[in-house]
Amino acid sequence: LTSMEHRSYMGSRLGTVFCSAILLLSISATPLNASESGDSAEERMISVIETVPHDPGAFTQGLEIFNGILFESTGLYGHSGLRKVDTTDGSVISQVSIDGTYFGEGITIFNNSVIMLTWRNGTALVFDSEDLSVEGEFSYQGEGWGICFNGDFLVMSNGTSLLTFRDPDSFEF
């Protein structure tokens, strides 16, 4: 699979046509400005305060800053891994590759460990945040896309509108 074919329904022509139709319908049903609908949304400006070089070959799936270090997970079969990146210059501090049968996805940090989802394997890999050694793994049903820790639970996405709240110690929901 190529980098853009990995998303099961997003790569299909039908999916593209469907998404385009929904977009056109939503645009045509949306008022041209907020005053027409009576709603007033606060406009915010975003300014870029710094840019840092990044590996253009990395198919980034997850990012998290922990203890001043940027943790990045990368995807693609045979090229997935986890790396620690210096936030000041974008250099890779250390990195590990994962088994080529896994497609790395989102990551989060819990108890000094990095938890990385895999796309279709139903496996979450657990890494030591210091040396990136594999500490263990959890199993789950379905696809793994994104994950975060909200202070109480691991919140996991499978790419749909469904979020799964999991116990961070057992990975059970």
Name the predicted role of every residue range.
Residues 86-90, 128-132, 168-171:
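Short loop/turn segments that connect beta-strands within beta-propeller blades
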Residues 71-77, 109, 114-122, 156-161:
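Conserved beta-strand positions in repeat-built beta-propeller and related beta-rich domains
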Residues 38-56, 90-91:
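A short helix->beta-strand "capping" segment at the edge of beta-propeller domains
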Residues 90-125, 132-144:
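Blade-loop segments of beta-propeller domains
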Residues 1-35:
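Secretory targeting signatures
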Residues 56-67, 100-111, 140-157:
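Beta-rich, blade/repeat-based domains predominating
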Residues 72-96:
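Beta-propeller domains
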